[in-house]
């Protein structure tokens, strides 16, 4: 746990009060902390899953990827929230948040509930100041509570990324319920794409003798697919907690870039070597002569920017180029993956 300035100052006051005759105990700390990492904010409070496993405490967790405020208002930024809680009572054990905006006030809300031994049901009742520039009608903390309540009450049966990764392919049926355009940008190996809007008409394509793992981008459509399937007699269904975004982030290889001291500034990059070695490559069109199509994708959340880029690219004429502006932090990675 992180005993930082806040607990230290409380301890100082308690010491002074007790010196003067008061009998005030120190109630302990739940280790709430926050840090700035370049333009991102990382925060934690309470007990994470790793500590709960070490203590032998049975728990569940939920992961969501909401926006910092209403998505239709400019400059909404993504954040990821994970909470841990008791399987039976719903008591909130801990929470971790990573994002760009609004992380501080959300971690404070979680810390307050944990400090007062509250539950995920208390998160559902959170009442905060709301206007589109500051939050959404359902605050991210409340959404975390709703998802946790769905798990406790059996409205969904989650599968976590570690479990899904370790299950042999022949023992699972991966159902990607995103749109065809999203699926074309990449999915889990072996996944079958049936968009959510088509699911009711294509249930005959699904096996009833194998476990079906539904997933989407962040979890919501996967949950809806889970509900549809279970209400139509499928009893072997689980939904990927946090969706494809969580799975990809957790399983992505860590790349360490190192400077090559022997390489001079004049040495061509690998990309330059590849391009120059292509004998059949068409002659490059001068940048000044190429028509530039400018696309504004600011404010859109994943997969909005990449789908907008794809739609623009599909309509390009020969020699035209695209210049796209986006605020979604994951867009450069998504664009590189799509181009490859």
Question: Residue spans of the language-model regions?
Answer:
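Generic hydrophobic alpha-helical segments
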Residues: 83, 110-111, 164, 212, ...
């Amino acid at each position: 746990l992180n005993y930082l300035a806040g607990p230290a100052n409380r301890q100082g006051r308690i010491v002074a009060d007790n010196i003067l005759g008061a009998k005030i105990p120190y109630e302990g700390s739940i280790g709430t902390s926050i840090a700035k990492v370049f333009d991102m904010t990382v925060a934690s409070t309470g007990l994470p899953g790793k500590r709960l496993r070490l203590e032998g405490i049975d728990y569940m967790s939920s992961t969501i990827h909401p926006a910092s405020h209403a998505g239709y208002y400019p400059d909404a930024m993504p954040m990821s929230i994970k909470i841990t809680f008791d399987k039976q009572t719903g008591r909130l054990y801990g929470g971790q948040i990573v994002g760009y905006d609004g992380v501080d006030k959300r971690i404070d809300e979680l810390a307050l509930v944990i400090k007062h031994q509250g539950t995920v049901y208390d998160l559902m009742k959170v009442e905060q100041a709301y206007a589109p520039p500051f939050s959404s009608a359902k605050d991210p903390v409340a959404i975390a509570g709703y998802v946790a309540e769905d798990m406790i009450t059996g409205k969904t049966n989650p599968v976590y990324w570690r479990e899904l990764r370790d299950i042999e392919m022949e023992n699972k049926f991966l159902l990607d319920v995103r749109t065809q355009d999203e699926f074309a940008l990449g999915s889990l190996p072996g996944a079958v794409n049936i968009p959510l809007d088509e699911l009711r008409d294509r249930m005959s394509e699904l096996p009833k003798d194998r476990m079906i793992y539904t997933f989407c981008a962040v979890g919501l459509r996967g949950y809806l697919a889970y509900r549809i399937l279970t209400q139509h007699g499928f009893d072997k269904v689980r939904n990927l907690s946090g969706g494809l975004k969580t799975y990809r982030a957790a399983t992505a290889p860590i790349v360490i870039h190192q400077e090559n001291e022997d390489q001079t500034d004049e040495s061509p990059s690998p990309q330059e070597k590849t391009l120059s070695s292509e004998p059949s490559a068409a002659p490059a069109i001068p940048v000044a002569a190429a028509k530039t199509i400018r696309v504004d994708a600011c404010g859109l959340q994943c997969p909005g920017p990449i789908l907008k880029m794809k739609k623009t690219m599909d309509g390009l004429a020969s020699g035209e180029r695209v210049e796209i502006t986006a605020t979604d932090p994951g867009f450069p990675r998504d664009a590189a993956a799509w181009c490859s």
